[in-house]
Amino acid sequence: MRKELWLGLLLSSQAVLSTIYYKETFEPDWETRWTHSTAKSDYGKFKLTSGKFYGDKAKDAGIQTSQDAKFYAISSPIASSFSNEGKDLVLQFSVKHEQDIDCGGGYLKLLPSVDAAKFTGDTPYHIMFGPDICGATKKIHFILTYKGKNLLWKKEPRCETDTLSHTYTAVIKADRTYEVLVDQVKKESGTLEEDWEILKPKTIPDPEDKKPADWVDEPDMVDPEDKKPEDWDKEPAQIPDPDATQPDDWDEEEDGKWEAPMISNPKYKGEWKAKKIPNPAYKGVWKPRDIPNPEYEADDKVHIFDEIAAVGFDLWQVKSGTIFDNIIVTDSLAEAKAFYDQTNGATKDAEKKAFDSAEADKRKKEEDERKKQEEEEKKTAEEDEDDDDEEEEEDDKKDEL
């Protein structure tokens, strides 16, 4: 009882101390908070929908890409811009590739102040995070910006590829570590400096270091004790074909003495080579020693974004139909988890059940159509057979006359 009370008080204190900077569940008035970019005239449009299947129609409503082979650009301001200095930064949202996407992005951007009408793929951003699918590429993108450069994540964990809703969470901690979760399950973690090329390396190979002249690079050597067997060269490489016979029309006076054609000798052992043994002098692969990098500059603020002011989707999709929902930006993973429990976590089982039911109906419809087609083909074949029988009867009558 005391343990449960203590945990409850701890969670309550975390909730009191935490801050939710942005939250979006896409209610019917969502367009009052979001702006489609007009920087290009052919951008695709988002629409509000729960999709073809859902667990709860109201809770599962989100914005969906609605036009194939289109770029999309839409953003929403954060009421009060903020810096994540001294605290964690958590970005979370759900993605539902209902269309069984073949090529397209599903990522969200954290932005500085932006002119929403002019928002494009070239607009500077702080973070780009989320799934990316195109052909064999099925990965979670996590790009950070540092001093104006967009830095790719060294890791490429696989993203979810089914047509159900999945929640992606990125956590950048105040100690410069990070976590990536999918449906509240940790998929990756590490340090920013190790998993992004943010800073110059602390050490570099010494350009003055040279490989010693007596360094042995070969891991194996010829066995000096191995000797070629005395009968190794006894058999020649080729021999006359023992199954060949002189043709009956062979004339030695005209054709010369007949000789059987030569064939490969199955007993020939080939060129003898002494066997290899481990080289006792082998020292391993040589590499120069590491020395401190004179260009390395420590920075304990690589995780800090001074002005986080908006969220936005900047996407390209070949086949539209992705639904985005339940965005939260906070400084507390516990808050993000609680939000998940209230939204996707609360409806995922019902959504899966609805999906399974829709798939069963689809299979039944396909089976009914297949049977109908088979019956029509069978009926057509029987009618053709009857026509053939009638023609044969008429031909028989004509023959009798």
Curated annotation (Swiss-Prot):
InterPro entries: Calret/calnex (IPR001580), Calret/calnex_CS (IPR018124), Calreticulin (IPR009169), Calreticulin/calnexin_P_dom_sf (IPR009033), ConA-like_dom_sf (IPR013320). Residues 199-214, 224-236, 348-381 have a biased composition (Basic and acidic residues). Sequence repeats lie at residues 187-198, 206-217, 223-234, 241-252, 256-266, 270-280, 284-294. The keyword Acetylation does not apply. It is found in: Endoplasmic reticulum lumen. Residues 1-18 form the signal peptide. Can be divided into a N-terminal globular domain, a proline-rich P-domain forming an elongated arm-like structure and a C-terminal acidic domain. The P-domain binds one molecule of calcium with high affinity, whereas the acidic C-domain binds multiple calcium ions with low affinity. The interaction with glycans occurs through a binding site in the globular lectin domain. Belongs to the calreticulin family. This is Calreticulin. It comes from Euglena gracilis.
